[in-house]
Amino acid sequence: MSVPGPSSPDGALTRPPYCLEAGEPTPGLSDTSPDEGLIEDLTIEDKAVEQLAEGLLSHYLPDLQRSKQALQELTQNQVVLLDTLEQEISKFKECHSMLDINALFAEAKHYHAKLVNIRKEMLMLHEKTSKLKKRALKLQQKRQKEELEREQQREKEFEREKQLTARPAKRM
């Protein structure tokens, strides 16, 4: 609730002197900055400034040093963590390369087994071809022998027929 100010001679209430209407300048204040004019009025003593600076430093310096040390420790811990992370990454890569190597060995085993089977089949085919060659040779020899025997038989029959044929007798 506001308290009415002194009344005017005609009895109307007036506003207090500290209340201003919008847009009215404040009496006694200028449009300049509050810091203007202070520098001229204030004389600075070097000793006071030095003591204030020392006090300010003594108040904030321990916290700043602790913060600096904490930051250094954090930086060192980060470096250690980065090194550890790099080592783990290299181990992970080695594991992947080991998996690749294991896969290659498994594939090599598979192809080795295939080669062994192919070798067995080739040996078996070689044995079969050798047996077939021997059999073919024997059959060829048998045919040649049979042909020779037939030829000899024909010659014998021819000789026999020749002997059986009538010959004119010789006159003596």
UniProtKB/Swiss-Prot annotation:
Superkingdom, taxonomy of origin: Eukaryota
Residue segments, region Disordered: 1-36, 135-172
Tissue/organ expression: Widely expressed.
GO cellular component, one term: microvesicle
Subcellular location: Cytoplasm; Membrane
Keywords tagged on the record: Albinism, Coiled coil, Cytoplasm, Disease variant, Hermansky-Pudlak syndrome, Membrane, Phosphoprotein
Coiled coil location: 63-167
PTM characteristics: Phosphorylated.
GO terms for biological process, alphabetical: actin filament bundle assembly; adenosine metabolic process; anterograde axonal transport; anterograde synaptic vesicle transport; ATP metabolic process; blood coagulation; bradykinin biosynthetic process; cellular response to epidermal growth factor stimulus
GO molecular function: actin filament binding; identical protein binding; molecular adaptor activity; protein homodimerization activity; syntaxin binding
Membrane topology qualifier: Peripheral membrane protein
Keyword Isomerase: no
InterPro entries reported for this sequence: BLOC-1_pallidin, Snapin/Pallidin/Snn1
Basic and acidic residues biased stretches: 143-164
Subunit structure: Interacts with BLOC1S4 and DTNBP1/BLOC1S7. Homodimer. Component of the biogenesis of lysosome-related organelles complex 1 (BLOC-1) composed of BLOC1S1, BLOC1S2, BLOC1S3, BLOC1S4, BLOC1S5, BLOC1S6, DTNBP1/BLOC1S7 and SNAPIN/BLOC1S8. Octamer composed of one copy each BLOC1S1, BLOC1S2, BLOC1S3, BLOC1S4, BLOC1S5, BLOC1S6, DTNBP1/BLOC1S7 and SNAPIN/BLOC1S8. The BLOC-1 complex associates with the AP-3 protein complex and membrane protein cargos. Interacts with BLOC1S5, F-actin, SNAP25 isoform 1 and isoform 2, SNAP47 and STX12.
Family label: Belongs to the BLOC1S6 family.
Noted disease: Hermansky-Pudlak syndrome 9: A form of Hermansky-Pudlak syndrome, a genetically heterogeneous autosomal recessive disorder characterized by oculocutaneous albinism, bleeding due to platelet storage pool deficiency, and lysosomal storage defects. This syndrome results from defects of diverse cytoplasmic organelles including melanosomes, platelet dense granules and lysosomes. Ceroid storage in the lungs is associated with pulmonary fibrosis, a common cause of premature death in individuals with HPS.
General function of this protein: Component of the BLOC-1 complex, a complex that is required for normal biogenesis of lysosome-related organelles (LRO), such as platelet dense granules and melanosomes. In concert with the AP-3 complex, the BLOC-1 complex is required to target membrane protein cargos into vesicles assembled at cell bodies for delivery into neurites and nerve terminals. The BLOC-1 complex, in association with SNARE proteins, is also proposed to be involved in neurite extension. May play a role in intracellular vesicle trafficking, particularly in the vesicle-docking and fusion process.
Protein name: Biogenesis of lysosome-related organelles complex 1 subunit 6
Record organism: Homo sapiens (Human)
Gene that this sequence comes from: BLOC1S6
